[in-house]
Design a protein with these regions (language model features):
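Intrinsically disordered, low-complexity, positively biased terminal segments
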Residues: 1-3, 54-58, 62-64, 89, ...
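Surface-exposed beta-loop interaction hotspot
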Residues: 133, 142-168
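Short coil/loop residues immediately preceding or within conserved phosphate-binding loops
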Residues: 56, 68, 77, 82, ...
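Conserved catalytic-core motifs of GNAT/GCN5-like acyltransferases
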Residues: 78, 117-121, 137-150, 260-272
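Conserved GNAT-fold acetyl-CoA-binding loop/helix
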Residues: 21-46, 167-188
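Hydrophobic adenine-recognition pocket in adenosine-nucleotide-binding enzymes
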Residues: 8, 85-87
Length: 285
């Protein structure tokens, strides 16, 4: 029987969380990589938050009246991010994932998104093949890094909490580096107290919504990025996502005791500019 798709509701969070936990656990365990979610309850809490967030679109797939998968779309910018997408392990490779992906891609296009992006676990061959067949192009190899906080400071690079008055400068910086801003994400992070900025010679030269799995960072130089990583009190979730091609910062992280948890790949449809600075994505883009 073909699946039916409908918008996600708050009542779906627990079941979607269970499926998400089991789906990611089965893939991670099969490839001997650490799990993304420590428990079904954590996954349900995350998905429940996305369902209720006005900046996200959620969709669930049902068969015979039972939820068998879900997908989400971050719509807070002109570039949108997909995920997490998860399918009941008993129904994987049966077209449910493709249907959920097509749904959010159609949603993004109907709303005029300039670009559509996602991060793919590099060891997962099937998802790489699926996303490529749907039109996504591999753009950037990434390494998920984790370890103890570095507690490092750099003279002349001052890191402090971001405030609402910093938003315009941070948005302009993001536009310079990426060609668009992520102002709604930044505003949310400032409100939550997780956003930080780095200042050099009296100017904001970098910001982060958190050195974490679900946070992004934009900087003018590698030294700005190192200052933000060095000042982080923790690395939230499985770790932070560093472009592996940034050899200077990648090697510096390894030399300071951080370790690679697993590799990922940034994939895109539509607008993509080679970033003109140092940066780190969220697990969505």
């Amino acid at each position: 029987m073909a699946e039916t798709l409908r918008p996600a509701t708050a009542a779906d969070a627990v079941e979607c969380g269970r499926i998400c936990f089991e789906a990611f656990a089965s893939i991670c365990d099969a490839h001997n990589f650490p799990r993304d979610f420590p428990s079904p309850e954590i996954a349900a809490g995350l998905l429940g938050g996305l369902i209720l967030h006005p900046g996200f679109y959620g969709v669930v797939a049902e068969r015979d009246g039972k939820i068998v998968g879900s997908n989400f779309l971050d719509e807070r910018s002109i570039v949108v991010g997909i995920g997490p997408v998860s399918i009941d392990p008993a129904l994987q490779n049966k077209g449910v994932g493709r249907a959920l992906m097509r749904d959010v891609i159609a949603r993004a296009r109907s709303r005029g998104a300039a670009g559509i992006r996602l991060l793919q676990a590099t060891y997962h061959n099937r998802s790489l093949s699926l996303y490529t067949s749907l039109g996504f192009q591999a753009r950037e190899p990434l390494s998920v890094l984790q370890g103890k906080p570095l507690n490092l400071r750099f003279p002349g690079y001052d890191v402090r909490p971001a405030t609402a008055t910093d938003a315009a400068a941070c948005d302009a910086l993001c536009h310079d580096v990426h060609g668009f801003d992520r102002g709604k994400e930044l505003t949310g992070a400032i409100g939550q107290g997780s956003a930080m900025v780095v200042e050099h010679q009296g100017q904001i030269t970098g910001y982060t919504t958190g050195i974490a799995f679900f946070a992004h960072t934009v900087c003018r130089t590698n030294r700005d990025l190192q200052a933000l990583i060095g000042a982080a009190s923790e690395f939230g979730g499985p770790g932070f996502l560093l472009p592996t091609r940034n050899h200077e910062v990648f090697a510096w992280c390894l030399a300071n005791g951080l370790r690679v948890a697993y590799p990922m790949t940034l994939m895109t449809i539509g607008l993509y500019n080679e970033p003109a600075g140092a940066w780190m994505p969220t697990v969505l883009y």
